[in-house]
Amino acid sequence: MASGGGGGGGMEAVEVRFRLDDGSDIGPSMHDQATTVTALKEFVLARWPQGKEIAPRTVNDVTIINAGQVLENNRTLAESRNLAAESPEGPITMHVVVRRSRPERRVKQPPKARPPERIGCGCTIL
């Protein structure tokens, strides 16, 4: 098995291919159905192709989508599968999205308060 993530309990392994945003793939590879989505993300992160312009730094930078559904980290592969959308032959293709790291924002300091302008009033005493 390519990755673990819990007791197998006799579940059949599943062949998964991870499709990257440029159309290239990681895999296909076999994964136990008890494997968590977090473990799948770690698998993808460890095998990320070198030299890509956008690369994840942590599992939090990676989102995996299967059959149009974003997979939750704490769920297993068995819980995340959509049998109606899968082909009986060949690997399951899961899409990998990398969230671009946001540049650190500098906190804008509020502009310095200017003293209120004096609005003059002309009074004439007769």
UniProtKB/Swiss-Prot annotation:
Main location: membrane
Protein function: May serve as docking site to facilitate the association of other proteins to the plasma membrane.
Domain Ubiquitin-like stretches: 14-79
Lineage, broadest ranks: Eukaryota, Viridiplantae, Streptophyta, Embryophyta, Tracheophyta
Membrane topology listed for this record: Lipid-anchor
Record Pfam families: Rad60-SLD_2
Keyword Ligase: no
Protein name, per record: Membrane-anchored ubiquitin-fold protein 2
Modified residues annotated as Cysteine methyl ester in this record: 123
UniProt keywords, alphabetically: Cell membrane, Lipoprotein, Membrane, Methylation, Prenylation
Biological source species: Oryza sativa subsp. japonica (Rice)
Gene3D superfamilies, sorted: Phosphatidylinositol 3-kinase Catalytic Subunit, Chain A, domain 1
Prodomain positions: 124-126
Residues forming coiled coils: none
Record lipid sites (S-geranylgeranyl cysteine): 123
Subcellular location: Cell membrane
One GO CC annotation: plasma membrane
